[in-house]
Amino acid sequence: MSRLALTRADEPMTAARVGIGGPVGSGKTALVERLIPALQTRGIDIAVITNDLVTAEDAERVRRSGLIDPERVSAVEAGACPHTVIREDPTLNIEAADELERRFPGVELILLESGGDNLASTFSRDLTDFWMFVIDVAGGDDIPRKRGPGVIRADLLVINKVDLAPHVGVDLGRMQREATEVRGGRPVLLTNCRRGEGIEAIVDLLEREVLFRK
């Protein structure tokens, strides 16, 4: 059960926290950079948390992008095991999210990008209300068949870099079909973050399933 579902009627509603996980190089940060303006265009007040092993590289990239007030971007150094701070002990990320909410009381949604990990990466429900897992076609169309916890359990599976499919010999239709099958019909969306394709469909889903606007 998500944090939002556990909020009592007499408690102030906190910002929705949306996790973004996936392997190294799948396009998580590129997705964050596409989601920021798409969410802002719809009037959604947002903030961002990024996780890296021992640096703030992704946070600095987002801050330099000019897409969002740099003060609204927080960095968490995850150490050697990026999954630990989003699953086993998410304290650092919870504290970072709480601090962003204190500093920006109107924030409605926090994008929380994990450090690059493997197909077993998942988010604690103590940390996120909704989480998506990003894979890319360059990793091969057999990724869904491997049934990693990230692929199966995520609220949304994003298949990114779809423009590369013909260049790496991937049957995109088969990949999407098999992903939907192993996920029991839960949503699978295709994106090309380099060109911004598929982003609006993700925002539609977040508005409907997380912010309950539709």
UniProtKB/Swiss-Prot annotation:
Q: Where in the cell is it found?
A: Cytoplasm
Name the major location.
cytoplasm
Q: Which InterPro entries match?
A: CobW/HypB/UreG_nucleotide-bd, P-loop_NTPase, UreG
| Hydrolase in keyword set | no
Provide the residue positions that the database annotates as binding GTP: 22-29
* GO CC annotation, single: cytoplasm
Q: Which keywords does UniProt give here? A: Chaperone, Cytoplasm, GTP-binding, Nickel insertion, Nucleotide-binding
Q: Does the keyword Lyase apply?
A: no
Q: Which domain of life is it from?
A: Bacteria
Q: Which GO terms describe its biological process?
A: urea catabolic process
A Gene Ontology molecular function term of the record: nickel cation binding
Its subunit composition reads:
Homodimer. UreD, UreF and UreG form a complex that acts as a GTP-hydrolysis-dependent molecular chaperone, activating the urease apoprotein by helping to assemble the nickel containing metallocenter of UreC. The UreE protein probably delivers the nickel.
Q: What does this protein do?
A: Facilitates the functional incorporation of the urease nickel metallocenter. This process requires GTP hydrolysis, probably effectuated by UreG.
The family assignment reads: Belongs to the SIMIBI class G3E GTPase family. UreG subfamily.
Quote the protein name from its UniProt record.
Urease accessory protein UreG 2
